[in-house]
C-alpha cells in the first residue's frame, strides 16, 4: 500500500518532535513510563466489564463484553520496552480488539516490569497467565496479540509452550516485532534516520550514535542476547501457529519481522507479512491512519471471528 498523505504528515510531525528532543529521549521515556505506571484512571466503556485476577506474582485483567458473540479469546501482551505496566491506553486497545473480533473476551497480562524485575520474570508471568487462561478457554480459540516487546514475548511464549508440550494458541498477531535484543538486523542501520520513535536525527551519523541504536536494554543486562527466549529471532519457529507480522519500512526493527517471516515460511507455517511503505514503529496504534484501517481489515479477513 502506497503511503497515505495523512501518514506522511503524521510521520513528519513525529520525526520533528521526537528527533528535536533526541538527547533527552531516554530520560523522557523513563519519566513517562513512571508517570504512566502510577496512573489509575481507567473506566471500561459501556457494554464491557473488567475483572482483575491475581495470577502468581502478577495480574490478569479480563475484559468481557456484556454481549459475548465470538468464541475467540484474545490473549494480549502489551509493549512498552519492558518498563511500562498495563496502562489505560492498552486497555482501550484491548477493547478495540474485542470489537474487531465480534465481541471477543480479552485477557490483558499485567506483567511485572523493569526496574522491579528483569529477564526472565516478565516472560514467566506471561507464560503462567496463559496457562491460567487455558484452564477456562480452549487454546484452539485463543489469538495472541503483542506489539514491540509484547510481540517479543508472544513469540517467546509460543516457543516455551512448544518446548514444554503445552497447547499453543490458534494464531499470533505481531505488531512491530522486536525479536532481536542485540539489535543486529540490517534495518537498525538502514532506518536509523527514518523511525520517529527509536531513530536518530539526520544531524547525527549512524557511527556516532551506534551505541545508542544497538542499545542493550537494562532488562537484559548480563544475559545472553542470543537466548531464543530473550531474542526469539534466534530460535526455532517449528510447529508454530498461524502468524501475522505487521511492520513498516521505516521501523528501526523492520528486519526482525523479515527474519521471523523467513523462518516461519521455512518451517511450513501459515504466515503473513504486511510491510507498509514508510510506516513507523507501532503505527497501527493510530487508528485514524488509512494504513491502520487497512491492516486491521486484512487481519480480520484472515482470522475470522
Residue map of PLM features:
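Alpha/beta-hydrolase superfamily serine-hydrolase fold, recognizing
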Residues: 9, 17-18, 51, 55-305
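A glycine/proline-hinged amphipathic helix-loop "lid/cap" segment
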Residues: 1-65
